[in-house]
Amino acid sequence: MHVGIFADIEGSFGIWRMRQCRMGTPEWQYGRECLTEDVNHVIKGAFDACADRVTVKDTHEVGFNCIIKKLDPRANYVGGHFIQPTFFGNVLNYDLVLYVAIHAASGTKGAFFPHTHYGIFSEVRLNGRPVCEADIYCAYLGEFGVPVGFVSGEDIAVEQAIKAIPWAKSVVVDKRKETYTSGEKSIKYLIEGRERLREVAAMAVREAASMKPLVVPGPLHFEAVFRTEELANKFNTWGFDQTGAMVCWNADNMIEGFEKFNKLTFFPKNIYPFRRPLAFLMRGFYRIKNTYFAPRPNPEGAASKA
């Protein structure tokens, strides 16, 4: 069995503030250590359950957040974003995906760093219903026959994801500062929480046969509400239907719908023909930058480095 571990960062154990997720900051370097520890425990869980192969796909921002030299060497690591299949790259040979450190949807009140796909949106709707990233990403993977069987993150993020994939296993992660800055109590929470990641990930892999690919039948109607009308005007270079700050598009399936979403978000029309070499160059640049030129970590009083 080939298990894919997709890694965001906001829902990691040890992280409690936004700048720990913002690339290039000393606080983010601490956040990377937190994420890497979480991912390593999920890798261990997958192999505990006799996975044949494990591939870690880094999905946050430019896609180079895990500290590669600290990852379990049994796993393959894929950083950066790809063109085909859009965003994630090759997903065809995964038997199961485990999604680590997710966050809540744009507009979720009281959530930690909520956003859907990118921070420019105040809400994203599919067929009239507000959706989180799990609704979109899991349905996209489902078009290729790949089920998502595990999620970890704060309570509301997990709750939103499980509505889309109720068969998935989950681990809830606390986002309060005091949880991670209270000495021995915090260290105990981190140890127990990450052991839970390992145990539940193993459970998901063992029960992979019961996990279903999420398929949302078309036709699909997307509505992306930008935070301002100015942002909508700036990003909508494709001439999608637009009313004020809301941009809409239709698709026959999630593959087409997600491709258009990425066009709107990441690829202005005049850049689109050059997307392949640009993606290749960006992967190389950020792999080097984030590996060799990262700042020293600032744990901001956390009880442990990760």
Where are these regions (language model features)?
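Divalent-metal (Mg2+/Mn2+/Ca2+)-assisted nucleotide/phosphate chemistry catalytic cores
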Residues: 73-151, 167-170
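Glycine-rich nucleotide/cofactor/substrate-binding loop typically near the N-terminus or early
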Residues: 37-94
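Short beta-strand segments
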Residues: 6-7, 57-58, 97-102, 151-152, ...
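Short acidic, Gly/Ser-rich segments with clustered Asp/Glu that frequently serve as metal-coordination loops
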Residues: 10-14
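C-terminal accessory domains and tails appended to enzymatic cores
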Residues: 193, 200-306
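Glycine-rich, Lys/Arg-enriched anion-binding loops that position phosphate/diphosphate groups
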Residues: 126-236
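Short catalytic helix/loop segments, enriched in acidic residues and glycine
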Residues: 19-44
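Extreme N-terminal starter segment of soluble prokaryotic enzymes
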Residues: 1-4
